[in-house]
Amino acid sequence: KNFGLYRERTGALIVCASDAEKLVDIRSQLASIARNLWSTPPAHGAAVVAQILGDEELKALWLDELEGMRLRVASLRRGLVEALAPHGLSERFAHVAEQRGMFSYTGLSPLQVQRLREEFSVYMVGSGRANVAGLDASRLDQLADAIARVCVN
Protein backbone atom coordinates (compact mmCIF):
# COMPACT_ATOMS: atom_id res chain seq x y z
CA LYS A 1 0.00 0.00 0.00
CA ASN A 2 2.24 2.77 -1.25
CA PHE A 3 -0.52 5.36 -1.32
CA GLY A 4 -2.06 5.35 2.14
CA LEU A 5 -5.14 7.55 1.83
CA TYR A 6 -6.97 7.62 5.09
CA ARG A 7 -10.37 9.03 6.10
CA GLU A 8 -11.88 7.72 2.87
CA ARG A 9 -15.18 6.12 3.94
CA THR A 10 -13.70 3.82 6.52
CA GLY A 11 -15.15 2.82 9.84
CA ALA A 12 -17.00 0.23 11.83
CA LEU A 13 -20.55 -0.13 13.03
CA ILE A 14 -21.48 -2.29 16.00
CA VAL A 15 -25.14 -3.06 16.60
CA CYS A 16 -26.74 -4.47 19.75
CA ALA A 17 -30.31 -5.68 19.27
CA SER A 18 -32.85 -6.75 21.85
CA ASP A 19 -33.54 -10.02 20.04
CA ALA A 20 -32.28 -12.13 17.14
CA GLU A 21 -35.21 -11.25 14.86
CA LYS A 22 -34.48 -7.52 15.08
CA LEU A 23 -30.81 -8.20 14.49
CA VAL A 24 -31.65 -10.06 11.25
CA ASP A 25 -33.75 -7.08 10.08
CA ILE A 26 -31.01 -4.60 10.97
CA ARG A 27 -28.35 -6.71 9.25
CA SER A 28 -30.46 -6.81 6.08
CA GLN A 29 -30.81 -3.01 6.04
CA LEU A 30 -27.11 -2.47 6.71
CA ALA A 31 -26.16 -4.93 3.94
CA SER A 32 -28.32 -2.94 1.51
CA ILE A 33 -26.62 0.31 2.49
CA ALA A 34 -23.17 -1.29 2.24
CA ARG A 35 -23.88 -2.69 -1.24
CA ASN A 36 -24.66 0.83 -2.46
CA LEU A 37 -21.37 2.12 -1.07
CA TRP A 38 -19.36 -0.76 -2.51
CA SER A 39 -21.03 -0.42 -5.91
CA THR A 40 -19.93 3.21 -6.17
CA PRO A 41 -16.53 3.44 -4.49
CA PRO A 42 -15.05 6.89 -3.91
CA ALA A 43 -13.00 8.27 -6.78
CA HIS A 44 -11.11 10.86 -4.71
CA GLY A 45 -8.19 8.56 -3.85
CA ALA A 46 -7.73 7.51 -7.46
CA ALA A 47 -7.76 11.17 -8.54
CA VAL A 48 -5.06 12.04 -6.01
CA VAL A 49 -2.86 9.15 -7.16
CA ALA A 50 -3.40 10.04 -10.83
CA GLN A 51 -2.40 13.65 -10.17
CA ILE A 52 0.78 12.62 -8.32
CA LEU A 53 1.85 10.03 -10.89
CA GLY A 54 0.92 12.31 -13.79
CA ASP A 55 3.15 15.17 -12.64
CA GLU A 56 6.90 14.48 -12.83
CA GLU A 57 7.75 16.85 -9.98
CA LEU A 58 5.11 15.41 -7.65
CA LYS A 59 6.06 11.87 -8.65
CA ALA A 60 9.73 12.58 -7.88
CA LEU A 61 8.78 13.99 -4.46
CA TRP A 62 6.63 10.94 -3.72
CA LEU A 63 9.38 8.54 -4.79
CA ASP A 64 11.87 10.42 -2.61
CA GLU A 65 9.55 10.24 0.41
CA LEU A 66 8.83 6.57 -0.27
CA GLU A 67 12.55 5.78 -0.41
CA GLY A 68 13.11 7.72 2.80
CA MET A 69 10.45 5.67 4.57
CA ARG A 70 11.85 2.42 3.17
CA LEU A 71 15.31 3.30 4.46
CA ARG A 72 13.92 4.38 7.84
CA VAL A 73 12.01 1.13 8.36
CA ALA A 74 15.03 -0.95 7.26
CA SER A 75 17.20 0.99 9.72
CA LEU A 76 14.70 0.39 12.53
CA ARG A 77 14.67 -3.33 11.76
CA ARG A 78 18.48 -3.54 11.84
CA GLY A 79 18.62 -1.35 14.93
CA LEU A 80 16.24 -3.58 16.86
CA VAL A 81 18.21 -6.71 16.00
CA GLU A 82 21.43 -4.93 17.02
CA ALA A 83 19.81 -3.82 20.30
CA LEU A 84 18.87 -7.45 20.98
CA ALA A 85 22.49 -8.65 20.50
CA PRO A 86 23.69 -7.86 24.07
CA HIS A 87 20.82 -10.05 25.30
CA GLY A 88 21.95 -12.96 23.14
CA LEU A 89 18.84 -12.72 20.97
CA SER A 90 20.15 -11.37 17.66
CA GLU A 91 20.07 -14.80 15.97
CA ARG A 92 16.58 -15.54 17.25
CA PHE A 93 15.30 -12.26 15.79
CA ALA A 94 17.58 -12.03 12.71
CA HIS A 95 14.51 -12.56 10.50
CA VAL A 96 13.18 -9.16 11.60
CA ALA A 97 16.05 -7.42 9.78
CA GLU A 98 15.40 -9.49 6.65
CA GLN A 99 11.67 -8.84 6.40
CA ARG A 100 10.22 -5.99 4.36
CA GLY A 101 7.37 -3.60 4.86
CA MET A 102 5.96 -1.64 7.75
CA PHE A 103 5.08 -4.69 9.85
CA SER A 104 7.10 -7.59 11.19
CA TYR A 105 6.23 -11.03 12.44
CA THR A 106 8.37 -11.21 15.56
CA GLY A 107 7.84 -14.86 16.41
CA LEU A 108 6.76 -13.92 19.92
CA SER A 109 4.11 -16.15 21.48
CA PRO A 110 0.70 -14.82 22.57
CA LEU A 111 1.84 -15.12 26.20
CA GLN A 112 5.00 -13.11 25.50
CA VAL A 113 2.94 -10.46 23.69
CA GLN A 114 0.59 -10.28 26.67
CA ARG A 115 3.52 -9.85 29.05
CA LEU A 116 4.98 -7.09 26.88
CA ARG A 117 1.65 -5.29 27.01
CA GLU A 118 0.99 -5.75 30.72
CA GLU A 119 4.51 -5.35 32.10
CA PHE A 120 6.14 -2.93 29.66
CA SER A 121 3.28 -1.13 27.82
CA VAL A 122 4.51 -2.51 24.48
CA TYR A 123 1.59 -3.13 22.16
CA MET A 124 1.28 -5.48 19.18
CA VAL A 125 -1.35 -7.94 18.02
CA GLY A 126 -1.54 -11.30 19.75
CA SER A 127 0.14 -13.09 16.85
CA GLY A 128 3.32 -11.10 17.48
CA ARG A 129 2.89 -8.91 14.40
CA ALA A 130 4.45 -5.52 15.18
CA ASN A 131 4.32 -2.12 13.49
CA VAL A 132 8.00 -1.45 12.79
CA ALA A 133 7.24 1.93 11.18
CA GLY A 134 5.77 3.08 14.51
CA LEU A 135 8.97 2.43 16.45
CA ASP A 136 11.01 5.27 17.92
CA ALA A 137 14.69 4.79 17.06
CA SER A 138 15.74 6.42 20.33
CA ARG A 139 13.88 3.74 22.30
CA LEU A 140 15.08 0.56 20.57
CA ASP A 141 17.29 -0.37 23.54
CA GLN A 142 14.30 -0.06 25.87
CA LEU A 143 12.21 -2.25 23.56
CA ALA A 144 15.01 -4.81 23.28
CA ASP A 145 15.26 -4.96 27.08
CA ALA A 146 11.52 -5.64 27.36
CA ILE A 147 11.63 -8.32 24.66
CA ALA A 148 14.60 -9.96 26.36
CA ARG A 149 12.80 -10.00 29.70
CA VAL A 150 9.78 -11.82 28.25
CA CYS A 151 11.91 -14.22 26.19
CA VAL A 152 14.38 -15.19 28.89
CA ASN A 153 12.09 -15.33 31.93
Please name every model-derived segment:
Residues K1-D25:
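Active-site PLP attachment segment
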Residues G4-Y6, P42, V73, S109:
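Active-site-proximal structural scaffolding
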Residues C16-A20, G54-L58, P86, R149, ...:
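Short, well-ordered loop/turn and helix-capping segments at boundaries between secondary-structure elements
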Residues R27-A46, I52-V81:
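Structural signature of PLP-dependent enzymes
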Residues P42-A43, H95-E98, M124:
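A structural signal for short secondary-structure junctions
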Residues L61-E119:
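Conserved PLP-binding catalytic core of the aspartate aminotransferase-like
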Residues E82-P86, L108-N153:
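PLP-dependent enzyme catalytic core of the Aspartate aminotransferase-like
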